[in-house]
Every structure is written in structure tokens, then in C-alpha cells.
């Protein structure tokens, strides 16, 4: 029999699908990795399970431990799912600018949510989590931006899936940068096997910190944290592409209407960057894999679908 012991065993092995109708002018073949097929509908399910597994194995979590994490939403949802399945209490700090759907999902999983000022971005959520942790020794912070289990799980799973499903023929890998765990983990494995594979990082044009610019507010939830995360290894990144807010929003809407892929704003940004790269003459005939991090249903109240409310 093939029966999972709990929901955390269902994470990973997400599919690739070829993009066909939003790819006008593309000279390369663009395929999307649909991370919404994870049980809590995002790429962060991978690290949610991995960080708790690693902490349990190291004896850092006890029955009365409270899992505390600063999150822009998806990691919190993943951790809330894992905590619900394993019986831990979960407290999450999150910028108040994150969508109402994300807040409701977190609470639906039984998590306690503490909102921080939107102007402070993820730095504010991190500071609040650190403040809380000092007040009670029961708190354990997985800290996705620093935890080596983050890129490690992408090396162990995401990279292997991409390699397997493309028969090792991936030429270019495109990923938005939140923590940087996805691109770092995947690049570590695939560059060893196929050094010519290029890795493209995506960040908001309104907050181009990785490109050497200044942080700023933007609506592309999940990427562009406003600082360079310690788990991100920039030496593994071949190019950084910035994407405008409207470009990301437009592409995300088109993916739903033209490809049948209901995705979030950061997926729109990632595909926008992938198409930018795919239109270059030197990439003719190449295979581009782009990560679509989550499901669009958790953005229905945002500007992404604002025109549908009536």
C-alpha cells in the first residue's frame, strides 16, 4: 500500500508544465515547476518540513516547544501545517501588508499571528520574533533566512526533481529570491553535474537590493525581503533580473487566463524574467525551468485580482 503517515510526507515531487500561450517572442522552451502542488500549496512546504525535521533530530524541539517564525506568509503557512500535523503550537510574526488570505490560512491551521508594521518589511517581522524569543525560553525560531536546512532540502529534493524531469537537460533555471534557498540548493547540485547551466535570480525593480540598489516597498509578496539573506550564495547566481510591479501583476493574470495556471504575484515576476531571458538570440532552443512558488487563490483580495471583486 502507498499511504502517507501524515501530510508532511506528501511534500515534493511537483510537476513541470510547458508554457505555450504567454511565450510570444520566446526563442527558448520555457517550462514551469508548479510548487502549488504541495499540500499547503507553496514551495515553502519543503523548508517547513525540513526545518522542523532537522530541529527534531537535533533535540531542539520538545513537546512544550513553541515554534516561532518571521514570515511573509508561505513559510508560516507551511510551518503551521507541520505544527498542526505534529502537535506543536505555532506563533508567527508577519508584515501587516500581507494578504488577508494568508492571515486566514495561518489561523485556519491553528497558528497565532502577530502583525508588524508594513513599512518595516521582513526586517520588522524578524526583529519582533527575536524580541519574543528573548522573553520565553520555550520559543524555537527555525529562521528560514539563516537555516542551512533551507537550501539543503532544495538540494536534496527540488534539484533532483528538476534533473530527473528534464533528463538532465536544463539549460537555465529561474527563481525569485525570498530567502534564496531554492536557487542556492538547486544550483549546488546541478552546477556540479552540468556546469554550463545558468541560474537567474529574480527580484523586484522597486527593491533591487541584490543588484546593489536600495530596498523599497513593493507588492510582490514572497520575494524582495530588503536584505541579502545569509542562506543565499550569490556566487552560484549567474544573473539577477529585476521585474517591475505592473509587469509581475500582468504576467500573473495572464498565466491564469491564458495558461490555466492560477498563481501568485511572485510567479508572475519569475515568468516575466524567464521570458526576458528566453527572447535572447543566444538562448534559442534552450530549456528554461522557472519556479512558480504558490497558488493564486491566496491573492484574491489583493491588487492582483482587484478588478474581479464586482
From Swiss-Prot:
It catalyses: O-acetyl-L-serine + hydrogen sulfide = L-cysteine + acetate. The keyword Amino-acid biosynthesis applies. Keywords: Amino-acid biosynthesis, Cysteine biosynthesis, Pyridoxal phosphate, Transferase. It is an enzyme of class 2 (transferase). InterPro entries: Cys_synth (IPR005856), Cys_Synth/Cystath_Beta-Synth (IPR050214), CysK (IPR005859), P-phosphate_BS (IPR001216), TrpB-like_PALP (IPR001926), TrpB-like_PALP_sf (IPR036052). It comes from the Bacteria. Disulfide bonds: none annotated. Pfam families: PALP. Its cofactor is pyridoxal 5'-phosphate. Pyridoxal 5'-phosphate binds at residues 74, 178-182, 266. One of its GO terms (molecular function) is cysteine synthase activity. Pathway: Amino-acid biosynthesis; L-cysteine biosynthesis; L-cysteine from L-serine: step 2/2. Its EC number is 2.5.1.47. The modification N6-(pyridoxal phosphate)lysine is found at residue 44. One of its GO terms (biological process) is cysteine biosynthetic process from serine. Catalyzes the conversion of O-acetylserine (OAS) to cysteine through the elimination of acetate and addition of hydrogen sulfide. Belongs to the cysteine synthase/cystathionine beta-synthase family. Homodimer. This is O-acetylserine sulfhydrylase. It comes from Mycobacterium leprae (strain TN). The gene is cysK.
Amino acid at each position: 500500500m502507498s499511504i502517507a503517515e501524515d501530510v508532511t510526507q506528501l511534500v515534493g515531487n511537483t510537476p513541470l508544465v510547458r508554457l505555450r500561450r504567454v511565450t510570444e517572442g520566446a526563442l527558448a522552451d520555457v517550462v514551469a515547476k508548479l510548487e502549488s502542488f504541495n499540500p499547503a500549496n507553496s514551495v515553502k512546504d519543503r523548508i517547513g518540513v525540513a526545518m522542523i525535521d532537522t530541529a527534531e533530530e537535533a533535540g531542539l524541539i520538545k513537546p512544550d516547544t513553541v515554534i516561532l517564525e518571521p514570515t511573509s506568509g508561505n513559510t508560516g503557512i507551511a510551518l503551521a501545517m507541520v505544527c498542526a500535523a505534529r502537535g506543536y503550537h505555532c506563533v508567527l510574526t508577519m508584515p501587516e501588508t500581507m494578504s488577508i488570505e494568508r492571515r486566514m490560512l495561518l489561523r485556519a491551521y491553528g497558528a497565532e499571528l502577530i502583525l508588524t508594521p508594513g513599512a518595516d518589511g521582513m526586517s520588522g517581522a524578524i526583529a519582533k520574533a527575536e524580541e519574543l524569543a528573548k522573553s520565553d525560553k520555550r520559543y524555537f525560531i527555525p529562521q528560514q533566512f539563516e537555516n542551512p536546512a533551507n537550501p539543503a532540502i532544495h538540494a536534496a529534493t527540488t534539484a533532483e526533481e528538476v534533473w530527473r524531469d528534464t533528463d538532465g537537460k536544463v539549460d537555465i533555471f529561474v527563481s525569485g529570491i525570498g530567502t534564496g534557498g531554492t536557487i542556492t540548493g538547486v544550483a549546488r547540485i546541478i552546477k556540479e553535474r552540468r556546469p554550463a547551466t545558468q541560474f537567474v535570480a529574480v527580484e523586484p525593480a522597486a527593491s533591487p537590493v541584490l543588484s546593489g540598489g536600495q530596498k523599497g516597498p513593493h507588492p510582490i509578496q514572497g520575494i524582495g525581503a530588503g536584505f541579502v539573506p545569509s542562506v543565499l550564495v550569490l556566487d552560484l547566481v549567474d544573473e539577477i533580473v529585476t521585474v517591475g510591479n505592473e509587469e509581475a501583476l500582468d504576467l500573473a493574470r495572464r498565466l491564469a487566463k491564458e495558461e490555466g495556471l492560477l498563481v501568485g504575484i511572485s510567479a508572475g515576476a519569475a515568468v516575466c524574467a524567464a521570458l526576458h531571458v528566453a527572447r535572447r538570440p543566444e538562448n534559442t532552443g534552450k530549456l528554461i525551468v522557472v519556479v512558480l512558488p504558490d497558488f493564486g487563490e491566496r491573492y484574491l483580495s489583493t491588487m492582483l485580482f482587484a478588478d474581479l471583486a464586482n
